[in-house]
């Protein structure tokens, strides 16, 4: 995949999000056999594939993005969706994850400003994992937070952005011994 050679940090982030999101999906959906966890994991791992079209000077900018750079960055979900459609790659659900992983429960996300039940459940799962990994990873523009600090920030400052049931279950993944199950 081009993402590996385009930006290794984004590649590592995609792997981390894939792991966290798959863990959350298994915790939420394990009793429902209609969900194909392997195909679902593909969508989680590919969620940022559209960033292979994002210039490195935007991805790795050491300071805040200006309005034009944010507009470029906000295109990556749509560009990833289009790439997978063009290649007829991944399932429809995986492509939806790629398109919707920056949508927020409160309607303040992008690219389509969906809210609540308008957002696919798989995208809601990916959103939580994506934010958690972004907070716990070193980036050119910020230091990393500990997992506890990240969960605290998500709870105190961002809670309205996440499906409340899914977020509570994500927090429980970090209770003693539960993440290894």
Predicted stretch roles:
Residues 1-181:
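Histidine- and acidic-residue-rich, metal-dependent catalytic cores
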């Amino acid at each position: 995949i081009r993402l590996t050679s385009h930006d290794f940090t984004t590649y590592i982030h995609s792997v981390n999000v894939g792991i966290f999101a798959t863990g959350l999906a298994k915790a939420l959906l394990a009793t429902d056999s209609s969900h194909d966890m392997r195909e679902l994991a593909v969508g989680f791992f590919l969620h940022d594939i559209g960033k292979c079209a994002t210039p490195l000077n935007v991805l790795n900018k050491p300071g805040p993005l200006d309005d034009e750079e944010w507009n470029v960055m906000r295109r990556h979900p749509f560009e990833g969706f289009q790439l997978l459609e063009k290649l007829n790659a991944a399932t429809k659900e995986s492509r939806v994850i790629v398109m919707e992983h920056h949508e927020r429960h409160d309607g303040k996300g992008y690219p389509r400003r969906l809210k609540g039940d308008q957002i696919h459940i798989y995208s809601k799962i990916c959103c939580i994992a994506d934010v958690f990994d972004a907070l716990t990873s070193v980036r050119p523009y910020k230091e990393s937070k500990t997992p506890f600090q990240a969960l605290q920030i998500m709870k105190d400052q961002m809670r309205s952005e996440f499906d409340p049931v899914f977020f509570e279950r994500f927090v429980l993944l970090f209770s003693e011994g539960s993440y290894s199950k």
